[in-house]
From Swiss-Prot:
Name this polypeptide is given: Cyclic pyranopterin monophosphate synthase
EC number: 4.6.1.17
Keyword vocabulary terms for this entry: Lyase, Molybdenum cofactor biosynthesis
Source organism of this protein record: Geobacter metallireducens (strain ATCC 53774 / DSM 7210 / GS-15)
InterPro entries, A to Z: MoaC (IPR023045), MoaC_bact/euk (IPR047594), MoaC_sf (IPR036522), MoCo_biosynth_MoaA/MoaC (IPR050105), Mopterin_CF_biosynth-C_dom (IPR002820)
Length: 160
């Protein structure tokens, strides 16, 4: 296994993608937020003191996709053509699954943008609900799907 973010002397580098042809790149990532079922019930009913939690988390996730190169030092600045954040809620378990999809016509993939988007949306949910539930956890941040480029299509086989 080789890591392409290092040169021959072991120094960190940004991978040179200048010789690659742009192709349509898509990635979907997920993050899981677990809270008390009553906290999620209040969130879904609009009974939070901080307003539209999922709406704000959606915007935070979209903004995060666009800001990824400022947070992940060796990621490439990309022209994002699409970013979306959706939520699947399970009221009986108090679980929210954040799903972020990013698309771009670029020379490198958008996996980091999708994962950053999902993670920041999950962190925003935590931030807006922590006053009501200190035990909220965030977990299972993972890539679910990627498409485009030399390596083609990849899909996670086991549930995240």
């Amino acid at each position: 296994m080789s890591f392409n973010h290092f040169d021959d002397q072991g120094r960190a580098i940004m991978v040179d993608v200048s010789g690659k042809q742009p192709t349509l790149r898509t990635a979907t990532a997920a993050a899981t937020v677990a809270m008390k079922p009553e906290t999620l019930a209040d969130l879904l009913a609009g009974r939070t003191t901080k307003g539209d939690v999922l709406g704000v988390a959606r915007l935070a996730g979209i903004a995060a996709a666009k800001k990824t190169p400022e947070l992940i030092p060796l990621s490439h600045p990309l022209a994002i053509h699409h970013a979306a954040v959706d939520f699947e809620t399970e009221p009986e378990t108090g679980t929210i699954t954040v799903k972020a999809t990013v698309r771009a016509f670029e020379r490198t993939g958008v996996e980091m943008e999708a994962m950053t988007s999902a993670a920041v949306a999950a962190l925003t949910i935590y931030d807006m609900c922590k006053g009501a539930d200190k035990g909220i956890t965030i977990g299972d941040i993972c890539l679910l799907f990627k498409e485009g480029g030399k390596s083609g299509t990849w899909q996670r086989e086991e549930p995240a």
